[in-house]
Amino acid sequence: MVGQIAVTASIGFGCAIFMTSLLNLLFDYPNTYHWIYLLYALIMLGAGLINMFKVPITATLNAFSAWWHMIGVLLIVGILIVVPDHHRSVGYVFGKTINNTGFGGGTTSGIVFFYVFLTGLLMAQYTITGYDASAHMSEETHSASIGAAWGMVMSVVVSVIFGFILLVAVTFTVPDDTKAAAAGTFVVTYIWQTSMSTHWAELLLFIAVIAQCFCTIASTTSASRMMFAFSRDRAVPGHQLWHRVSKVDRIPVYTVWGVVVLAFLTPLPAWWFGYVGYAASTAIAVIGLYIAFMLPIILRLRAGDKFERGAWHLGRHYKWIDWIAILWIVFICVVFMLPSYYLGVPWNTGFDWNYVNYTPLPVIGAFLLFGGWYVLSARKWFKGPIRQGTEEELARIEAEYEAPVAAPETA
């Protein structure tokens, strides 16, 4: 749950960064992190309001979002191929290495650069996180035993293909390494504006911002359904409130707004520490989600042949695939909690709190908080998932839904 809320925050905050760039070009909107956070608040508010719509409406938005992403990527790539007067060489795109972390004095070889490379995997790993959304929406999916599984697989495949094409196209148009690095958070805007023109940059940013808004809405939907499911199983503090849904549309209203508020607070360090705070939020999202992904994989290994397979399964290959997945998750969870900037290491000369990777604090804090809660309390009464609830609960819920109502009150 921690990872799902954090990834919602990361997506929304990334959207706010791109939206700030667009508004800065259009209206000279301030591009400081305080103003970015203001936009972020409005984006999360909008995501919450849209998630109040009926399920068929949000499903239509998700379908439109998928087409927007695919067509949008093709448009951006096509424009980046045709419009810029100058493109980088293939050797530059696939062979150029840059180290702006301060480690090793900027070296691009040896063990130091290998360390820099590993910490730089964060954003790549972050992009491969949302595929579990299909599972969260399985109760609202036709033929979920097959559809949800294929949704997870295809989301990764599509992300890899379209994401790689987009990254390569952008890299071919990088005008100047030094100035691009100096642009920091707004590096993409700098690349597009310098390689083409302000108007072209505005168009591409508009496409990207709309796509990110769709992602924020979808992630809010996914996180709210996860929180609702956990609450229904009585696994979340205050579950009596969180598992309630609206009478008319059966929307988990309270979990939607709970996710919105928690996601809004997650990247709060960015208010003071800028991009480093946002990057740490992203690391929390990756670590939290992948630990959650790892737990059922471990349980599958433990079950062995006693495990009852579903309609979609890995067959006899599950063992080696599971071990690779577990080892990789353990590895990245360690790497992404390490310092990513030289100035963020306390004993280094010029140490600056603005460069500290604070990821270990909330990650370890969450383990202590929720682990302690389980040891001291939850293990005494939590009996595992409640798939459908008791017969009495089902009868009461269905009776409430069938009763006529004059307004969409909550139950």
Name each region found by the language model.
Residues 50-56, 200, 262-281, 302-306, ...:
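Transmembrane helix-loop junctions in multi-pass membrane proteins
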